[in-house]
Amino acid sequence: MTTEIHDATINLSIVSHTNIGKTTLARTLLNRDIGEIADRAHVTVTADPYPLIDVPSGARLILWDTPGFGNSVNLAKRLEARSNPLGWFLGEVWDRVANKSQWLNQKALLHVRDITDVVLYLVNAAQLPEAAPYVAAEMKILKWIGKPVIVLLNQMGEPKPSREERLEVQRWKDALKGCDIVKDVLAMDAFARCWVQEFALFESIGKALPPVYEKPYAELKAAWREHRKKAFYQSAEAVSAFINARVSDEAQVEDISLLDRVRLFGKSVGLFKNADMTGDPAKKAQTELVHRAEDDFNTLARELLAVNGLTGQVEPKELFGRLKASWHQASAGKKAKAGL
């Protein structure tokens, strides 16, 4: 008989080789800034917990960001040797003095082994599995941890057709098919992923968890889906409102004298280069439309950032560069011609 747990705390740990993108992915899943991101090894030095989702019943899902593996081969040997006194001494005492990063790795992995329910193992998809020498050693580390593993393919590059993505995922599945601890392989780029991929991840996590977590995890998964769907629908509504406002926006162009028309034509063909055209009614109307579009776009950007739990600045220069170059100007028809 399986005992159900209702107020469970389920722990997920993101692990990977150093500088693969663990903290970036954690930020994406958490929808908030955590830790430090830099293009160097060993930026994260401790295992840190972050609440991912919770429900009224008391169930919680916790995401742990961990230090990246450095020398995976030596680290695997250290972990495997911890069961004997000399191995323990080297790992706990010697490495603490002589190899601080390896000592921190061991402390973090001991914690992962003791508390984690599912391990999320991040790899660099830009490399072929057989061309990533650290993977074999890190599979030994994950086997030592002894928890179910879901492999996530990061750094997938530009979005590609679904068939190509499936082939890439299958290539990694084939390379890891001898590893019993690996329960699934998924594409999960920290930048190019979408919420549908997150749903697939949550499905895989549920299948990897022990049966006692079935009910609380179902509640957590449902809450996560609703949270993500709400953000998606709010984002879609905001974008739709912006597009609709731009499509229906217009500005009246004032009529100009014959002399001003001649000057405008002359400037357009290279004559009157120094002519003052600040009074050009068409330019005034275009400027008015662009300013409204800029204001609305900045409002949209702030709304999308808030809805999706992001921070940062948006640079709309490219968009408004195109707006200033692409125009449709409708003119009133002559009454005499309209009567024909």
Where do the language-model regions lie?
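Conserved C-terminal guanine-recognition region of P-loop GTPase G domains, centered on the G4
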Residues: 83-184
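Short, conserved acidic/polar surface loops in the N-terminal third of protein domains
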Residues: 73-77, 131-132, 161-164, 198-199
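Conserved G1/Walker A P-loop phosphate-binding module
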Residues: 1-88
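Extended helical scaffolds that flank P-loop GTPase cores
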Residues: 195-198, 205-340
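Canonical P-loop GTPase G-domain recognition
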Residues: 155-223
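Hydrophobic, Leu/Ile/Phe/Ala-enriched alpha-helical segments that form helix-helix packing faces
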Residues: 29, 33, 172-176, 205, ...
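Alpha-helix N-cap/loop-to-helix initiation residues
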Residues: 43, 128-131, 194
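Conserved NTP-handling cores and scaffolds of large molecular machines
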Residues: 29, 33, 70, 120, ...
